[in-house]
């Protein structure tokens, strides 16, 4: 009898994430396959749809589907993405996104805790240290008893004790300094801030805390304490001043008369002196808003007991190789790596295997951080003081350490703030993720990062409504050969200088800005000479002192000199005759809420409201300009109060933010759609329709409105023509925010001005960098001195003058390595930046 043999066909595993009909933001119903298990780059000009594809489709669907598999109880505690506007996404893995702007950590976070390097250090100091006997203070040799949970015997007094555990050495737990609670910082009342204007009387509000933090009737109580309240504060006797600042909390009988003057009430009231008023308010603070009210009366300094180390005296006693935990945490990562490598050899032979395991765990984490160029950071550096790029690299290194597989990682511009010397380290981290069986999608503009991709997708061809299409896809070689690609010339390194080079003889023709400084942070004492009326790039590896030199020294010094005030303590002298303004144009978001839009920030909306108020329809309806305000006007949408969105409180689920169903995001009520103004081609437009247009579209639609046209043209010239007028400013990228802030400065004479930009190329495509260079040219042509802190090689190549800091980061930096034209820097053997020019 014949046997029937069943043959099971093995199903092929998916090879790609299949996206069909994606319409998120400006995506044009696109279909694209993203290879699985590869490093995939997404390129395109700013606003072309890169992030919409990577974050709005791939990450949104990958994370949402994973979360939907969890219980309702768990989901309600997590932020959930809504369904992406896409027909179908197949084979998308669970997704994690590393965003462009990681959140700023709290006051208890340090570089060591963020990277978990502190965990290894604490374990090392618990298991391998010379511990101190709590009975007689003698030191005990390292012993395996600690790891075994056994007691130690003091060789001096013979008594037994248990060594501290790793938890006992944590400043967020048992090892916290009792005085500062493990923050390393003490807040004390600044008495000088309590009475800022001593020419006022107490009745006139001389004692500020009594007016802002306490009942106003404290003035009357002070009078009952024997203080004259009707004479200028600077005429009070020392005894009276002491009562105001430090008087005892005694009850006084007063006759309280309300402000309306009707009736008087006898009261017994306890006197709160000015200092205690602030201390009492500080003790009751429950949130950041409350702290802001009190902060103006406080000064911060290192804790007097722990010296800013955050650790208790007991936690600072164990020693390894002659130093304690606080001293180890004060090292830079680079120094700590060298120190940790030498620890096992310093211990008894029987302890070396255990110490080696602990040290290896530290070194494996540290290796990636060093590769990413963070070796200059000290382990005790407060997490809140790290830059955006530094926080992003910490986040990236943490992800690699997890060694997960089958995950989709979406990285949003990980090269931000990264010196060219550290790009190889970044690529190595991404390759590690791919080698572990993950898919990495990286949105970036750095051609050195994009050139390493296994597969490249280019969005475009332009920004905004004209973008949202896939204009090239394939291997890097295939994209380089693509006729429609806009990134191809930059991948092929067809680079040329766009601005004429100023010769050495002409460089200082328009004058000098000179400054001499003492040491501050890691910057050594130095003298710097900056040419006026030029584009000057300040370069150097991360931590080399660029920010300290420019933002913490040059700008404050120029502002102080212009105002006739004292120079900062570390500035010896500054010579900048004729400089009246020093403007920092940074990448911080504009506005704190959705009510701030491109049109309101650029002073366009007010002019549009006046224009619509002049129309016959508005006059007939009785609408003045104020009625067209979406914040307070009669024509704002009553459902969303002019925000364009509403928040739904869904039981058992997180609040959901949706577009307002009444106005569909326009912010205006139905009545606003009945007021029209004639456009360029005779078409009739409403204000909500205009606010939904891009800057470039609005240029054609607002012919006849000279002020509006001038401001729109400025935005167009700044490369912001793709932004819609109603776009909320907090949602703009860092580069967009910088250029929008510049709008009010364009067109005026600038020969008394210095403009400082902190990494303005963040988020910019190489083509956008060319637009930015033309913006800088516009400022320089008006006489301005433009100083740019930058890593972008295209911008550095086009600078008139370069000041290169370094040679390394941290203690290995802080000096001017060389200064001159880009060609001079490229020829300088000591310059790390020069090697890449």
Model-identified regions with their sequence ranges:
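Conserved phosphate-binding elements of NTP-dependent enzyme cores
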Residues: 1-837
